[in-house]
């Protein structure tokens, strides 16, 4: 349970889970650098897993229902087939800036349960890193995940809000050993849940010191 709690810290600690086993996990693709500093990667893959884990809220029996939910998650397990495909684009101009854009479509086929609860259908990752001077780096990272569902007692599932997060990171290098950094998370103040019933913080900031050994 320790390993699974590193993935979902809200998991019911009394649960006993079967180990997941991958019988196939393959990816193929084409990668090419079509111009100086620019390359693309078109890829697709297929994965077969026995006893894949899908996190859903804990539902109380009718006699115990308050708000229906307990304060833990449970893990449904089912044999799953996962097909995916996407494209990854990157562009780098000297040492001034880097741009990346990645889109992935996921298709799930699961046994015994109606849906791949909690898994996104579409994912988009984008980022840009700018280095105006050698000591300063600023990065903007965006992640969008759509098409997620959770289980609230009805087999067809309930739609979850899209993950829609924009983060900003800035670093300043003082010397070869020390540096400063500032990270602003969810600067769009979006409200969503990574796991149903546990909303993510709408905004957070972190400042610190980098030490290179």
Regions found by a protein language model. Give the residues of each.
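Conserved C-terminal beta-signal and adjacent last beta-strands/turns
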Residues: 105, 116-213
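Short, functionally important structural connectors and interaction interfaces within domains
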Residues: 9-10, 69, 170, 179
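Outer-membrane beta-barrel domain signature
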Residues: 13-19, 72-78, 111-117, 154-159, ...
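Gram-negative outer-membrane beta-barrel transporters
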Residues: 36-53, 58-147
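Asparagine-centered polar/low-complexity signal
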Residues: 27, 75-77, 167, 186
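Surface-exposed extracellular loop regions of Gram-negative outer-membrane beta-barrel proteins
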Residues: 1-26, 44-68, 143-153, 189-202
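Structural signature of Gram-negative outer-membrane beta-barrels, strongest in the C-terminal barrel
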Residues: 1-49, 93-96, 129-137, 173-175
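Membrane-embedded beta-strands of outer-membrane beta-barrel proteins
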Residues: 26-28, 32, 42, 85-87, ...
């Amino acid at each position: 349970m320790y390993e699974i709690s590193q993935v979902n810290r809200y998991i019911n600690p009394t649960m006993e889970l079967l180990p997941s086993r991958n019988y196939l996990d393959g990816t193929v693709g084409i990668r090419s650098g079509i111009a100086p500093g620019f390359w693309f990667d078109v890829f697709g893959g297929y994965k077969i897993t026995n006893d894949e884990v899908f996190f859903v809220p804990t539902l109380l029996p009718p006699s115990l229902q308050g708000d229906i939910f307990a304060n833990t998650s449970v893990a449904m397990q089912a044999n799953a087939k996962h097909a995916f495909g996407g494209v990854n684009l990157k562009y780098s101009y000297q040492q001034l800036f880097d741009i990346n854009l990645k889109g992935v479509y996921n298709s799930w086929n699961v046994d015994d349960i109606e849906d791949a609860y909690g898994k996104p259908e579409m994912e988009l990752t984008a980022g840009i890193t700018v280095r105006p001077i050698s000591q300063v780096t600023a990065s903007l990272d965006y992640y969008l995940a759509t098409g997620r569902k959770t289980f609230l007692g009805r087999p067809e599932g309930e739609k979850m809000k899209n993950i829609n997060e924009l983060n900003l990171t800035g670093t300043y290098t003082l010397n070869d050993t020390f540096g400063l950094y500032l990270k602003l998370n969810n600067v769009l103040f979006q409200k969503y849940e990574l796991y149903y019933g546990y909303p993510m913080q709408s905004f957070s900031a972190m400042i610190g010191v980098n030490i290179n050994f």
